[in-house]
């Protein structure tokens, strides 16, 4: 997971922790600014990860859109089969490059949400709306002016 943070208030930490607790995912942080997150070794780059552990099945990305092209190039260089850009991580040039290189590309989706949906976890929380989006819904107002 590129951009995984040791800060428990960051979305990348929440997703990292969730996937680890599922028991069937082997998630490693890629973050050059930290040695480990929750006792899991962090790698400074995808290349460093691949040299030690092999090619990951999915490269999950929590970085700003302007930082995606070098990440895509590194994913291509190590032979990654898939790249997943989290909610709001959209860079059309990087997406096109990854797609043209033959990677499976997932854009504007959260791997935690999709995992929970796949496992039936959204239904347990009453959240199985079948609508997955990064856009906030506008609150509707009642005729009296209150929020619904």
Where do the protein language model's features map onto the residues?
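Short acidic/polar active-site loop segments enriched in Thr and Asp
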Residues: 25, 57, 81-82
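NAD(P)-binding Rossmann-fold cofactor-contacting core
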Residues: 5-10, 17-38
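Short acidic, glycine/proline-enriched helix-loop-strand junctions
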Residues: 53-54, 92-115
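ADP-ribose/adenylate-binding Rossmann-like module
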Residues: 75-98
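A charged, well-structured terminal subsegment
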Residues: 114-148
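Glycine-rich, highly charged phosphate/nucleotide-binding loops
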Residues: 37-69
